[in-house]
């Protein structure tokens, strides 16, 4: 829990900057057509549908086709979000893409999206905070709108994790899926939209979830390829302990910063990593099932894309409506976490 002094200090800073509000005026998602079921995985590795569902809650996931990339998926989601917002790309001031699986080390995937949609006025950059990346990017774009620096921002979470997986490792290949989700944020004098943010990290856990090679420490070589260092490595037990410890706590803190009680929240949208983690956090927050968004069964862990994809499904299915309060929470590699509250 936040100390009273810290709460007052952070709230004052956020409220001083919030003379303008950053409203979500458009949303969109994209998931590849190809569905990979647990039954299909059971023919590839030593696993079963029962084993996967008991441990993760996942039934199937989407896998990108060969011609699809993180940028192309992000572009699909961006166009859908702009369509819902009723805006053309030249209305955008900023594009942020949160991803751990960019098309290239450089240039930024956001620049590829900017070119693809024709958002010629927009600045563009990427954010990398693993599965917490989208909510982190949302805090950046929202804060820039609230400060008056910009009027509109396109925030995207997109991943093509399937390209990095070891499809012989049943402990990792069953977990992940591909996809993208996007928000369009717009400045407004009306109270609402993004109300608070809470970010944190525990860098001492940096080795807990890591893709060891491909960066400047271990650049591409035959040795790194032979050693399998271009595949994600995860201490699943440590990640579970971290996630269940952090997710409920940061959701509470974000609510406090927005002067909200958990009873005021219509929907909790957590990162869709694992059903057991989601259930543990929901129990900690004493939230009933109808107030918790779950779609990990259909998409698996889509990393930075999971929160916006889940939000889009909640909106499209009528789970949330204008005026509702929502909490978004992401956590992942770093170890890092981020939460935001918003009013629709």
Which residue ranges define each predicted feature?
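Condensing-enzyme catalytic core mediating Claisen C-C bond formation in acyl metabolism
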Residues: 5, 10-66, 169-241, 245, ...
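Buried hydrophobic positions in well-ordered alpha/beta secondary-structure cores of metabolic enzymes
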Residues: 24-26, 52, 81, 92-95, ...
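Acidic, glycine-rich active-site loops and adjacent beta-strand->loop/helix elements
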Residues: 30, 98-103, 129-132, 157-162, ...
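Conserved catalytic cysteine-centered active-site region
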Residues: 51-72, 99-153, 283-311
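Phosphate/pyrophosphate-binding loops at sites that engage ATP/ADP/AMP, CoA/4′-phosphopantetheine
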Residues: 77-93, 249-266, 314, 318-319
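Flexible, glycine-rich active-site loops centered on histidine and acidic residues
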Residues: 146-180
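Active-site pocket-lining segment
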Residues: 230, 243-248, 262-285
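Catalytic phosphate/nucleotide-handling subdomain of diverse soluble enzymes
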Residues: 309-329, 337-344
């Amino acid at each position: 829990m936040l100390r009273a002094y810290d709460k007052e200090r952070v709230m004052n800073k956020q409220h001083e900057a919030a003379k303008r509000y950053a409203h979500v005026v458009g949303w969109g998602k994209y998931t590849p057509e190809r569905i990979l079921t647990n039954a299909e995985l059971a023919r590839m590795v030593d696993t079963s549908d029962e084993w996967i569902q008991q441990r993760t809650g996942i039934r199937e996931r989407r896998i990108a086709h060969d011609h699809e990339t993180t940028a192309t998926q992000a572009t699909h989601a961006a166009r859908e979000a702009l369509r819902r917002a009723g805006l053309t790309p030249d209305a955008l001031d900023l594009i942020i893409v949160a991803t751990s699986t960019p098309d290239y080390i450089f240039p930024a995937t956001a620049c590829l999206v900017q070119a693809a949609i024709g958002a010629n006025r927009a600045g563009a950059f990427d954010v990398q905070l693993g599965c917490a990346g989208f909510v982190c990017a949302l805090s950046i774009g929202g804060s820039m709108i609230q400060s008056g620096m910009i009027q509109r921002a396109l925030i995207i979470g997109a991943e093509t994790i399937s390209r990095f997986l070891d499809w012989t490792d049943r402990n990792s290949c069953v977990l992940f899926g591909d996809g993208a989700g996007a928000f369009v944020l717009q400045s407004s004098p009306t109270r609402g939209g993004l109300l608070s943010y809470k970010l944190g990290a525990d860098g001492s856990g940096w080795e807990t979830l890591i893709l060891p090679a491909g960066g400047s420490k271990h650049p591409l070589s035959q040795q790194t390829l032979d050693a399998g260092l271009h595949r994600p490595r995860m201490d699943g037990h440590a990640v579970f302990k971290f996630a269940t410890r952090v997710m409920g706590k940061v959701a509470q803190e974000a609510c406090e910063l927005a002067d909200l009680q958990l009873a005021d929240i219509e929907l909790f949208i957590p990162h869709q990593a694992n059903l057991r983690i989601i259930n543990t956090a929901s129990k900690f927050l004493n939230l009933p099932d109808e107030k918790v968004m779950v779609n990990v069964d259909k998409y698996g862990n889509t990393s930075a894309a999971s929160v916006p994809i889940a939000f889009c499904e909640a909106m499209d299915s009528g789970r949330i409506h204008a005026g509702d309060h929502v909490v978004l929470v992401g956590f992942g590699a770093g170890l890092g976490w981020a939460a935001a509250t918003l009013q629709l």
